From Swiss-Prot, chain A:
Keyword Transport: yes
HAMAP family in UniProt: ATP_synth_epsil_bac
Functional note: Produces ATP from ADP in the presence of a proton gradient across the membrane.
GO cellular component: chloroplast thylakoid membrane; proton-transporting ATP synthase complex
Record's protein name: ATP synthase epsilon chain, chloroplastic
Species of provenance: Coffea arabica
């Protein structure tokens, strides 16, 4: 049996093809999905999606969302997804530094919420590059 | 030589009928500057419309100006038309996402109907302050597009004031920004710039802002004001409630009509027996079944928590896209009208110009004949 992965963002289809195995960053920890997985619905955290294609591992930074695993059909709905190879390392590192600085400066409940989210996104992007 | 010619010309003009009074007036001005004329009159002899006749030259200049303007408006129209197509493509690209999302949301809602769930984004609080997200365009020259949405916002503000509610504005788009900056008495939470093509990132920025405003309980209700794209010639400003999301409301048919995902559903803030209530009208449409056996990895609340921000995002993105499409369509119509007007103006100006030119030629012939007659 083959496993089909479909990663959708509001803008475009990021990934729509066959994979061997994926590791999905869910809210309750990472789960590996192989063919013939039981149908589940899960929330996807901000984190790294690992995809195995013929013995090769690819990474993708996911910005939080939702995944539905059906009969060998995975649909991942996320706000934004970027392939690790498409991220500019320098730019990602800079964004991370800015986000860290912003969190330190943040005052009040609202700014802290915003800064925390931004920091987590930035960190994930950097990790997606380095994880390869 | 040229000076005597001039006086001759002026005298011959006076002998003409009243209809040329205007051109006579303008042709008299060069007489006051004879030095200027004597230099230009001789080299430009072959071209019939010499600088002496300012009326003609002005007309010609105006025709050229109108022609240039027409070229610009025509180009803008074509650009807008091309961009409308791109905007439509963006909507089409967003469709698979919103379709799957609505499908999943619908089914999860179905399975959760019985449970008593409590998700922050769906919490309906007594409304004290309302956040208004106003989506305008970045540029003008698009007819009444920006005006219409700003008027709608003003009307809504007046309405909220009438209800004794506080409000704050999140302005998206340069036109709205400059409008609200000029009016400091309107509280604005944040100014955001639109870009040429709305992306998920932009929607995310707005969603983040809205999200934190709502979660930190600064506002108790968020409304989105944008221009709904109906057709190329019709667009209307609408108000759509973003938050609180109704956990039962996100329903639509999945047969491709998902761009209008929650359009069937309208929220109105009204007063009922002296209390503020939110009215909901929901039109239920059929949805196809999907795999019945679905386990939830986490708590249903957590899953909804993950889904609703996505939904919020896609709603905002869609409204941005619709707003852009409306703006471009409005610009297309406005520019097409401008081009038509320019054509008309050009036509009437050329008629006037040709008449004047003929009058001038007639005058010259009269002059020559009179001169010849005098000699014999």
């Amino acid at each position: 049996m083959t496993l089909n992965l479909c990663v959708l963002t509001p803008n475009r289809i990021v990934w729509d093809s066959e994979v061997k195995e994926i590791i999905l960053p869910t809210n309750s920890g990472q789960i590996g999905v192989l063919p013939n997985h039981a149908p589940i619905a899960t929330a996807v955290d901000i984190g790294i999606l690992r995809i195995r294609l013929n013995g090769q591992w690819l990474t993708m930074a996911l910005m939080g969302g939702f995944a539905k695993i059906g009969s060998n059909e995975i649909i991942v709905l996320v706000n934004d997804a970027e392939k690790g190879s498409d991220i500019d390392p320098q730019e990602a590192q800079q964004t991370l530094e800015i986000a860290e600085a912003n969190l330190k400066k943040a005052e009040g409940k609202r700014q802290t919420i915003e800064a925390n989210l931004a920091l987590r996104r930035a960190r994930t992007r950097v990790e997606a590059i380095n994880a390869v | 030589m040229s000076c005597s010619n001039l006086t001759m010309w002026v005298s011959s003009k006076t002998s003409l009928s009243d209809s040329t009074a205007l051109s006579f007036r303008s042709s008299i001005t060069p007489v006051q500057l004879p030095s200027n004329n004597s230099t230009t009159a001789n080299p430009s002899r072959p071209s019939s419309v010499t600088p002496i006749h300012c009326g003609l030259r002005e007309l010609r200049d105006r025709i050229v100006t109108v022609k240039n303007t027409q070229k610009i408006t025509e180009a803008m129209k074509l650009v807008a038309a091309a961009k409308v197509r791109r905007a439509q493509e963006a909507v089409v690209n967003a469709r698979p996402f919103s379709e799957s999302l609505v499908e999943v949301l619908y089914n999860i809602n179905e399975q959760l109907q019985t449970d008593d769930i409590d998700v922050p984004l769906t919490k309906v609080r007594p409304v004290k302050k309302v956040g208004l997200v106003v989506v305008t365009g970045d540029r003008g020259l698009c007819g009444g597009f920006n005006n219409a949405i700003i008027k709608k916002a003003e009307a809504r503000i007046a309405e909220l004031k009438g209800l004794g509610l506080d409000y704050t504005i999140i302005s998206v788009g340069k036109k709205g920004n400059s409008y609200f900056i000029r009016r400091p008495y309107i509280p604005v939470d944040r100014f955001l710039d639109g870009t040429s093509l709305p992306t998920a990132k932009e929607a995310q920025a707005i969603a983040d802002d809205v999200f934190s405003l709502f979660i930190s309980e600064e506002v108790d209700k968020v409304e989105l004001l944008y221009t709904k794209f109906v057709s190329l010639v019709k667009a209307e400003p609408v108000i759509h409630t973003l938050l609180p999301l109704s956990p039962k409301g996100e329903i639509c048919d999945i047969n491709g009509n998902c761009v209008d995902a929650a359009e069937d559903e309208f929220f109105r803030l009204t007063t009922k027996e002296g209390k503020l209530t939110v009215e909901r009208d929901i039109m239920r449409t059929k949805t196809t079944e999907f795999s019945a056996i679905l386990q939830f990895e986490q708590d249903p609340v957590q899953i909804l928590d993950a889904l609703l921000p996505l939904y919020l995002n896609s709603q905002i993105l869609r409204s941005l896209q619709e707003s852009l499409a409306s703006e471009l369509a409005a610009r297309m119509t406005a520019m097409s009208n401008a081009t038509d007007n320019a054509n008309e103006l050009k036509k009437s100006l050329s008629i006037v110009y040709n008449r004047e030119r003929q009058a001038k030629i007639t005058g010259e012939i009269l002059e020559i004949v009179a001169g010849a007659n005098a000699l014999t």
